Amino acid sequence: EDGLTHKLRNICQEYPDQQIMEYIAVYSLEELFHAKLLPIQYGSIPGRGQLAGKRKIERILRRKFTGRLDVVKCDIHKAYPSVTVECVMNLLKRDIGKNKVLIWYLGALMENYPGEHLCIGGYLPSWLFNYVMSYVLRYLLSLSQSRRGVQTKMVKAIVCYADDFTVYGYFSQLTKALKKATRWSKSTLGLDVKPAWQ
């Protein structure tokens, strides 16, 4: 049981040899993670973390935007269990498909995951979750609407910590953007985005 939220979590305790293999995998994927993870992601990434995320939120609220701004706090429902090995492998094949040996190695490592989804508590799964999450965030940031021939971004800013993220913008645009992102992430990645209007 989680001490803060009192949620029951299925934590995975990996064997030492699995942990070593996962460290090798993360090292091998460094270039991919450097290219794909966004600067707005703060969870389980060295040099970032909660304090850096908090400072980013403060900068957004104090300096970046003048006038009124609406904020939606969102999270991914059952985040790690929602990310299947199949989903991760499809994205990896798309991005590093030419590296057959690395694809084989990652597939073999993830065969050990119970339930065929990412495990809470593993080193590689935390990086892979951020990798999958970057697709959701990138999709949200790409949304725009055209009015009188002028394109405007529907989402002004995002700050993400693991599966929790805050989205900044104007209420009407955020409503549309989150509906689109919820549909897209469910159909494409199998993730269920839960917005909580505050």
What do the predicted segments below correspond to?
Residues 22, 26-84:
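Active-site-proximal segment of RNA-dependent polymerases
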